[in-house]
């Protein structure tokens, strides 16, 4: 079953015949001219995945699906949003140009909204109707007028996914189904690229489980270093002598109060040794030498 728009249905019969997109949490049920909507039971869901199936989910979560592990909010994301929640006037002219997407005009609306909703956990204004959720989708679709609001929601998800693909980011990081957070992260990525950097996205979502080696704990890394899969180690050291090194101003994961257990399944042993003093002391303690075979011993 392919996903396409129905041929010009009448408005009067739309509520009866047209598919419905549910906007959660309990915000609206919206008619759409798209056909091929499905109720997907898979919790790990992305817009790109649905497009490959030539279908689309019939439920979109404005603040992220609590059952989708790709929408789980890492503490690192909260700190990242805190860093980029300033006013538009705090950015340079070049950075303002990077903030033109998606509305066409420089704006920090999504950055500040993501900070409010995800870092400060304050979503009551939208959930109670004091702030209209439609404004977010109008900005994503650049003010395009729609006969059916469900089309506006689906087109917004598609527009986010297309931006993600153009920027070369994985759909496990930008799912296309978490509109406010997705746009905010794409804007942060655009701001970093002005400085020749890119988000070290493995730190922010469960997408880093796909990568066994995670040597860089900086929130951003040099773009040219990211081309090689094994080049994350010592990103910051390559240009450490540069007095204008943008990495000097970036956040570092070690500032977060996370237990060592958080990293055990995500970092190789040498990385844990590098960043944990107690483990390093235990590892280098000569008392363990007797447990290792001598170099001269025969097998």
UniProtKB/Swiss-Prot annotation:
Residues 66-69 are annotated as: Involved in inclusion bodies formation. The record marks 21, 23 as: Essential for suppression of TBK1/IRF3-mediated IFN response. It is found in: Host cytoplasm. Coiled coil: none annotated. Its main location: host cell. Keywords: Host cytoplasm, Host-virus interaction, Inhibition of host innate immune response by virus, Inhibition of host interferon signaling pathway by virus, Inhibition of host IRF3 by virus, Inhibition of host RLR pathway by virus, Inhibition of host STAT2 by virus, Inhibition of host TBK1 by virus, Inhibition of host TLR pathway by virus, Interferon antiviral system evasion, Viral immunoevasion. Residues 148-220 are annotated as: Interaction with host TNIP2. Transmembrane segments: none annotated. One of its GO terms (cellular component) is host cell cytoplasm. The keyword tRNA-binding does not apply. Belongs to the Bandavirus NS-S protein family. Plays a role in the inhibition of host RLR-induced interferon-beta activation by inhibiting the phosphorylation of TANK-binding kinase 1/TBK1, thereby blocking IRF3 activation and preventing the establishment of an antiviral state. Also blocks IFN-triggered nuclear translocation and activation of host STAT2. Interacts with host TBK1; this interaction antagonizes TBK1 phosphorylation and inhibits TBK1-IRF3 interaction. Interacts with host STAT2; this interaction blocks the nuclear translocation and activation of host STAT2. Interacts with host TNIP2. This is Non-structural protein NS-S. It comes from Heartland virus.
């Amino acid at each position: 079953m392919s996903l396409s728009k129905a041929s010009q249905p009448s408005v009067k019969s739309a509520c009866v015949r047209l598919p419905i997109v549910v906007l959660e949490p309990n915000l609206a049920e919206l008619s759409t001219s798209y056909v091929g909507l499905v109720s997907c039971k898979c919790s790990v869901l992305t817009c790109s995945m649905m497009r490959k199936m030539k279908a689309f989910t019939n439920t979109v979560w404005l603040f992220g699906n609590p059952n989708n592990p790709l929408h789980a909010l890492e503490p690192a994301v909260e700190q990242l949003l805190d860093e980029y929640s300033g006013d538009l006037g705090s950015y340079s002219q070049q950075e303002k140009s990077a903030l033109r997407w998606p509305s066409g005009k420089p704006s920090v609306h999504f950055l500040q909204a993501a900070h409010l909703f995800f870092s400060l956990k304050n979503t009551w204004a939208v959930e109670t109707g004091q702030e209209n959720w439609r404004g977010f989708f109008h900005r994503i679709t650049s003010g395009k007028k729609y006969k059916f609001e469900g089309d506006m929601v689906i087109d917004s998800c598609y527009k986010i996914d297309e931006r993600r693909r153009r920027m070369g980011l994985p759909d496990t990081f930008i799912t296309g189904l978490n509109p406010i957070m997705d746009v905010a992260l794409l804007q942060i990525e655009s701001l970093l690229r002005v400085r020749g950097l890119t988000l070290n996205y493995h730190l922010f979502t469960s997408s880093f489980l796909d990568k066994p080696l995670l040597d860089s704990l900086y929130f951003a890394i040099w773009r040219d270093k990211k081309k090689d899969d094994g080049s994350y180690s010592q990103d910051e050291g390559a240009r450490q002598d540069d007095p204008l090194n943008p990495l000097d101003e970036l956040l570092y994961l070690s500032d977060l109060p996370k237990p060592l257990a958080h990293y055990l399944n995500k970092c190789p042993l040498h990385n844990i040794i590098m960043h944990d003093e107690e483990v390093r002391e235990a590892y280098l303690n000569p008392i363990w030498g007797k447990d290792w075979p001598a170099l001269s011993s025969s097998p």
